[in-house]
Amino acid sequence: MRRRFRSGAAILLLGSVPQLLAQTGAARPGTRVLMDAHNCYPYEGRWNDRIERALSGGVPVAIEQDLYWYTDPITHKSWSVVAHQPPLSGKEPTLTTYFFDRIRPIVEKALRSGDRSKWPIITLNLDVKTEEPEHLRAILQMLKDHEDWITTATRTDDIRTQSPLTIRPVLVLTGQSDAQQQIFYDDLRPGDRVLVFGAVHTFDQDPMAATQVLEPARANNYRRWWNNPWNVVEAGGQMQAGAWTPKDMRRLRMLVDHAHAQGLWIRFYTLDGASTEAMTRNGWFANYNFGSEAAVKDRWRAAYQAGVDYIATDQYEELAAYLHALRSVNRR
């Protein structure tokens, strides 16, 4: 079955000027399906190779980073660290050392090449675990330090008025928190660059509610994507999922089509399928496990066919290879 993606005409500009796109080209919702590397960082002193694994399948790719605000108990100095959960030691990597420094050669190569057809090539998905104003401002400063790499919009007087995206190699997404919107958007001056884009609010008290109940708002200048657990597709989520059915596919398509009609990218998390032993050995979580390779591939294929923008998984290499195979078949 062929994917039902909406095509968008890319605007090609001469020289080194970034592409200015109003939700068109590769950045347009519904244009491409990416592997989203869930929890792509070390923790418990293990799994230090996760970012290498995520990048091994090539670009474009999405990478999730969880951020905490750490305060040294002796010096009382504070900084942002990449971590999974407390307790924190202060020895955790920062977003700069773990993520930005690692992707530097990839981004600089992309900037030199002049081929912007696949930009953004890396989506950074921020899961901000603690929202101290100082933490949010520190995150924003780290993004400003890499501003020449990052896809931006222009802060408008009315948030409902979307400015075109200036496309660069990296796109930064974050959560639906109003506290984050305050720092990342509201406190900016009109005309300033918007460096990170929030998720729309999801009203999922009933996860199987109608799409317009779950997500009633169109994309605005700051909120440009929709993040969902899988239980909005299959009741009960991964651990209660049975065989994949046409009814499930219709539900998935409804959610994806609704998001794209609202001008939103859509992400689903987290689609794994492995043995209990493999899940434990790799630091993956049972509540995301469909239980088998066959079961998760049914969902990966369905997500690809429906045009899900970001498929989050812990099985980076497997999903990247599977998407490559599906694209190859689709091109025939």
Residue ranges and their predicted role:
Residues 23-64, 68-332:
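Catalytic cores of phosphodiester-bond hydrolases, prominently lipid phosphodiesterases
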Residues 1-9:
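Bacterial N-terminal signal peptides that target proteins for export
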Residues 8-19:
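Bacterial N-terminal signal peptides
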